[in-house]
């Protein structure tokens, strides 16, 4: 065995161990302190959102009109510090949530948590809006601008510049976990979804023995087809052409694509609701009945009524976070680049 093969095997083993550790860590964090109590992450996310909402006077309602005016460009000033307009900063953040997170995330919540999980997704979204308001405002307030005029912000800068240098270790920890998270929820899931969908269609079109769809083994650990590799190369090339231009190029591209994605998503949802208008009220009944109903059919929720309710709540909050990123902190990194001298304006956006 030469050095190249040894390196590939070592990389494959390390990747597998990191994946296994990441899955176990993810499940442990979300189920802590125990599977028969309300998980700490649910209390932290929803509880903090409720406290901030009440303490700040329901900003998601109070500043809604102002946020729309800011996003429309009413207060744009090209001389303000920053890299992107308010609209571009918003679309950059939205590009990470519109699509897989809103569609696959909701479907997963329904499958594992039952109809009642949608209620907890609504709760997470409503109170999570205040968390986004706070984290985006703070990220603009405590961002840094280098000598070339480019901005750098996010929760890591908020922690270090707002809480003091003694908390720099926490800022570094957040940045590290954010990088790890970006590989999974920010890239791997979307790439896999695109590749898997194209592969499924190609499999029906060409069959399993075609050179594009035939599975090949890699070190007896992974199996993939030539088309899946090709999909990855094309996606990497397209993304590379965008990100090589920096945050301004990203903002320009998302400024065009994100609104199209959002319009298609909303129109599709409305058309589905119109087509199934006779089932809308019964769907609402299922959702509210499944919130605290211990007889709801929930996958993997053995252990009685309490476990069923906790699983429904947990899946709703988990997928709610994945769908809107409220409280995660990643959206604030994009919003911190907005051109404004008034941090609260970007918070309202």
Regions inferred by a protein language model and the residue ranges of each:
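N-terminal alpha-helical transmembrane segments of multi-pass membrane transport
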Residues: 1-100, 110-117, 128
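Alpha-helical membrane segments and immediately flanking helix-loop junctions
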Residues: 79-111, 138-162, 169, 173-176, ...
């Amino acid at each position: 065995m030469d050095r190249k093969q040894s390196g590939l095997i070592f990389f494959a083993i390390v990747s597998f161990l990191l994946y296994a550790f990441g899955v176990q860590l993810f499940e442990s964090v979300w189920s802590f302190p125990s599977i028969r109590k309300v998980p700490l992450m649910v209390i932290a996310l929803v509880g903090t959102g409720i406290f901030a909402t009440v303490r700040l006077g329901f900003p998601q309602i109070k500043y809604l009109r102002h946020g729309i005016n800011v996003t429309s460009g009413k207060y744009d000033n090209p001389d303000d510090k920053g890299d992107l307009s308010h609209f571009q900063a918003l679309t950059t953040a939205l590009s990470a949530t519109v699509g897989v997170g809103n569609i696959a995330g909701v479907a997963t919540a329904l499958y594992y948590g039952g109809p009642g999980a949608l209620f907890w997704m609504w709760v997470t979204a409503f109170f999570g809006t205040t968390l986004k308001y706070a984290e985006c405002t703070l990220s603009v307030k405590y961002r840094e601008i280098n000598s070339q005029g480019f901005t750098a912000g996010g929760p890591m800068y908020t922690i270090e510049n707002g809480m003091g240098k003694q908390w720099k270790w926490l800022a570094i920890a957040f940045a590290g976990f954010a990088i790890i998270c970006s590989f999974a929820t920010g890239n791997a899931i979307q790439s896999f979804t695109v590749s898997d969908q194209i592969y499924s269609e190609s499999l029906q079109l060409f069959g399993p023995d075609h050179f594009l769809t035939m599975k090949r083994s890699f070190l007896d650990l992974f199996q993939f087809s030539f088309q899946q590799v090709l999909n990855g190369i094309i996606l990497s090339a397209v993304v590379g052409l965008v990100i090589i231009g920096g945050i301004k190029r990203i903002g320009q591209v998302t400024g065009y694509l994100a609104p199209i994605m959002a319009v298609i998503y909303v129109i599709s949802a409305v058309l589905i609701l119109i087509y199934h208008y006779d089932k809308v009220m019964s769907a609402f009944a299922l959702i509210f009945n499944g919130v605290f109903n211990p007889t709801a059919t929930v996958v993997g929720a053995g252990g009685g009524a309490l476990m069923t309710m906790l699983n429904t709540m947990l899946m709703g909050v988990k997928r709610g976070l994945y769908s809107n990123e409220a409280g995660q902190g990643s959206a604030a990194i994009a919003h911190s680049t907005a051109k404004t001298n008034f941090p609260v304006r970007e918070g309202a956006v």
